């Protein structure tokens, strides 16, 4: 009866293959731009980068949802909703170690931005662990620069490089409808473009992941056009 049918081992096999591909691409001087049906693939990208160097890097995670559940907090068992917590070493620990290059992210190297739909226990866990969180409402009230700049400057004092994660559901569905899970109150493309430009000015973006774009919800192509422009803003 679950709406999220999934075989965990198959997912982690995919993450492992992606990690190996990321390492190969970076070794060949290519920039990894990963398009995936969900956010779990980020575990492959992040740990592919980890496998290349011991030098720490940050993760800036734009998503309507926290993706910070664990098997102990998730009300649905949805694996995709646990990937950021897993990357931080807080869930699926044995499976995570099967990914080449895996090592837990430091919490102080994570920024979650654009959220507006958190599960209650997930939100408590993020607060308990001290995840830097800038919600969509803060960006609406202060602007992208005003809301994000303090957190980005703090992260820049710790790392030089980042992985940029962009779940399409962070966008406002009434403007860019290309995701089934998006809820109202999302970011406008202009706000996200400003945010991505700020990232590019402060960090070396080592890789970028784009998750959960569903073209069947984007009949007029609005989301696709916005995503293309946002990729240009982030990586040129």
Listing of model-derived features with the role each one plays in the protein:
Residues 1-236:
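Conserved alpha-helical scaffold segments that buttress catalytic/binding sites
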